[in-house]
Amino acid sequence: MTGRVESWLENPTRRYPISCTVFVVEDTMDEHPDGLEGSWQFASKALRYGAGVAIHLSKLRPKGTKNSHGMVASGPCGFMEIFSKFNEILRRGGTYRNGAIVAHCDADHPDILEFVNYDRARIPWLKRCVNVDPDIINSPDKLKAIMDAARKGDVWIVKKQYDANGERIYSNVCQEILLKSRDTCLLSHINLGIVEIKDIPTAFKDGMEFLCVDLTTWFLSDCQSCDSCWCGG
């Protein structure tokens, strides 16, 4: 049982927590709903409800590059401090919230060395994860830096993954599931000791509906018109 679920069970009058979710940041400040400003709103809401949120920063341009407006990019690393501060402040406000936030960056991003060597003291409430593929073997300096940081406990390492259609899917906080941006991993519990075998399918379906709709209020509007998910909408 995750800590945030256990915390809710101890005080079920609070909103049930989302367990884990993913956000892929687009390379813009505010011209796209999934830009940096959108990621701050998304992370804030997730952390307020005790969620774990993985923020993938690899689409951001490298530090020092210019955009079409002549603005100089900050790169992905400086924004990690904002996400760390979000987690720190939201944990302290009111009732303690057992949220978590992880910043992800691909190993082939030009700023990866800054990412893995970033001063931990500046991002105490944030974890880091490096997304790698077999090509990392061809960059021994990067590989050594990543492995050294992993040995010190400064970063985690996860493989890049793609779905059956060749589309990128992204690791969540615990690295137990791969999701697309804004997708969510939900946790609930079914007591198999009191369920007849014939009732198991219904138990899981009812459990998911109860979890997604009745408790979290995070039911996605996109699901209302889809034909591929559990809801059969």
What is each of the regions a protein language model found here?
Residues M1-G233:
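Extended catalytic cores of very large enzyme megasubunits
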